[in-house]
């Protein structure tokens, strides 16, 4: 069968016009069908893209963040809500359809990090949601924030949620592995260290910690290509794995 070549701009966060190296990925192991992805690596610097392009990229990221944040503020909310809170990996899923539950709400924003979560957390907890499933931190690493910064912000997120909505159940989901040969600032060794800290924090606060990393990793701790085309975000099969791993917590 003839290979199919498709050019796709993959964004670490939301939208950008800066594209870098192309990689060829086998889509169907039973055929020669493949796609060529134009990937935006984490190593974009002013040596690779001019300052104006990077400035426009950052402006687009911030605009997307505030557009989503303001949209969420306009939507109805109740104490029955089950919130999925995170970055683009959360943002890209249709959660209420996945669980066939209209109480499940997507509050992911592409490009978000732990600082962004803290900035908008009050808008989420003021309605006293039933549950919050959190996955955040991979972008912190891409933005060169330290592990201690990520961990400290998690503590603030947990404490702030408890202070404003003490009945809300908080579920800490591990950061997913990546293909760190492409996404070079998101080293899986660092992700593992963060996840170890998140598991410890969950014990300290008597929260449920959900180890998704182990479900998505290969033997060498990279994101299994069965679940992703770009080495960072998930495909449909990946979201089904995620759903099955947490279904009992959503339903409890």
Task: Give a label for each model feature.
Residues 157-161:
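Hydrophobic positions in alpha-helices of CheY-like receiver
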Residues 1-83, 95:
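N-terminal secretory targeting modules
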Residues 83-85, 91-103, 114-152, 175-179:
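Oxyanion-hole/transition-state-stabilizing segment in secreted/luminal serine hydrolases
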Residues 165-169:
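A short helix->loop->beta-strand "cap" motif at the edges of active sites that frequently abuts
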Residues 147-156, 187-195:
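Charged helix-capping and loop-helix junction motifs
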Residues 21, 177-252:
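Catalytic His-Asp segment of secreted/periplasmic serine-dependent ester chemistry enzymes
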Residues 48-59, 101-114, 142, 231:
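Acidic/histidine-rich helix-loop elements
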